[in-house]
Amino acid sequence: MKKLAQLRARTDRQLAELISAKLDDGFSYARVLTAREPHAGRAELREFERRAEDAWREADHLLPALGGVDEAARGTLLRRAGILREALDRYTAEAYPIRRAAGF
């Protein structure tokens, strides 16, 4: 039973690290989007947006599986996911104002 608990703890730790890495990736892509790099083309920005969204989606999908990590670590990951989501929503609202106004 002790081995099973150790395995579960290690798996939870690895899952938390994976989620954190996905969020880091998402923040990296979002930073490029919000910096409005003058040399970045429209296709490039759409690719960064897609990758940031994918990173957030993957992290958000994995978060409910975090059962064995302490509440502080879980809370930190949830807050980071929320901040990334807000940044992406803000970018979308600014980059596609017509889409937002039309409710798409």
Predicted feature locations:
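Short, solvent-exposed, charged loop/turn and helix-capping segments
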Residues: H61-L77
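Short, charged, amphipathic alpha-helical segments
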Residues: A43-D54, A73-G82
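Charged, low-complexity interaction regions
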Residues: A35-A43, G67-E71
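Short terminal alpha-helical segments
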Residues: M1-P38
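Amphipathic alpha-helical binding modules
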Residues: A73-F104
